[in-house]
């Protein structure tokens, strides 16, 4: 029976499908590109003008924002992102998620902004690095404990 089913699977013919024609004429694609670029230009404020207070987002951290001269310039042509997966303590994750939800930002943009802010403040950056090193050693100790516990359960 299994040989018969295997033979049927091997000999099964795939349906014939006509090849797709995905080629778009060059003039249409150029029109779409220029239209998209025009929409981007109209939606983004000019980089040499500064935003008025009405345009600035209201936030609890407005006093600690980056200076206008030090703000990174984001342009659609050079903007690249990298996908990362990070492990965060569940309580910290929940509190950060709540903060980001209230402020209507993402964890990624919060992390970027915090890093850029700390780069301007070397003393605070040193404190954060010290705290991060302490948390890393705690995590390593917990991982060692869990590993030893698992090994003990396997051998006993």
Curated annotation (Swiss-Prot):
Residues 24-50 have a biased composition (Polar residues). GO terms for cellular component: carboxysome. One of its GO terms (biological process) is carbon fixation. InterPro entries: McdB (IPR049816). It is found in: Carboxysome. Keywords: Bacterial microcompartment, Carbon dioxide fixation, Carboxysome, Coiled coil, Plasmid. Its main location: other. McdA and McdB together mediate carboxysome (Cb) spacing, size, ultrastructure and probably inheritance in the cell, together they prevent Cb aggregation. McdA is an ATPase that forms dynamic gradients on the nucleoid in response to adapter protein McdB, which associates with carboxysomes. The interplay between McdA gradients on the nucleoid and McdB-bound carboxysomes result in the equal spacing of Cbs along the cell length. Stimulates the ATPase activity of McdA, causing McdA to be released from DNA. Undergoes liquid-liquid phase separation. Incorrect positioning (aggregation) of carboxysomes results in reduced CO(2) fixation by encapsulated ribulose-1,5-bisphosphate carboxylase (RuBisCO, cbbL/cbbS), which leads to slower growth. Homodimerizes; may exist in higher order oligomers in solution. Forms a complex with McdA:DNA. Homohexamerizes, interacts with shell components of the carboxysome. This is Maintenance of carboxysome distribution protein B.
